[in-house]
Amino acid sequence: MSAALDAAQSAFGGPPSVVVNCAGIAPPKLVLGKKGVHPLDHFTKILMVNAGGSFNVCRLAAARMAAAPPLEGGEEKGERGVLINTASVAAFDGQIGQAAYSASKGAVVAMMLPMARELAASGIRVVTIAPGVFLTPMLEGLPQKVQDDLGKQVPFPSRLGRPSEYAALVQHIVENRMLNGEVIRLDGALRMPP
């Protein structure tokens, strides 16, 4: 991760002022499946990729932001940037077979406020987006009927979310300095069934 941040810093001529964590894995596994109990290493892997990966990026990016001078022309005195993490509605509405995924996204939600409070002294905000069902590469591989059925579960608009809608929220978070220490559900009022 340090190498990726080095590359970004070199390409953009300075440390990042906006970092978006938007990756994860979600392989389902029952706690008590037909093939036995849920392997602990499966649980640990999902937790480490989703929560550990988000934390790792945040800590490394925050160190670079904190060491940099405040943003020139920044609206707020001492502003250095924003870290935006991606959780999931599964953090709140976990489904059967998704104990590990829900726990990992719940951890992303849980670490956000302590990080926002700590990093505020350095002029760094932390915000988490909890998307519902979005047309991501993970879902694009599903048959169209499955995609349509997932979209119909969303009260309004009754469809899968679009990446452009996620991006629009990211842009708003960047521009609205009062958004700090918050989780924003982006789900069309979806509440996942068991």
Regions found by a protein language model. Give the residues of each.
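Conserved mid-core segment of classical short-chain dehydrogenase/reductases
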Residues: 26-44, 63, 67-77, 97-100, ...
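Catalytic Tyr-x(3-8)-Lys segment
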Residues: 48, 145-165
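Alpha-helical segment proximal to the catalytic Tyr-Lys
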Residues: 63, 116-118
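Active-site helix of classical SDR
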Residues: 58, 104
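Residue(s) in the substrate-gating loop at a strand-loop-helix junction
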Residues: 88
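Short, small/polar-rich loop/turn modules that mediate ligand/substrate recognition or access, typified
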Residues: 120, 125, 179-182
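C-terminal substrate-recognition "lid" of short-chain dehydrogenase/reductases
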Residues: 162-186, 191
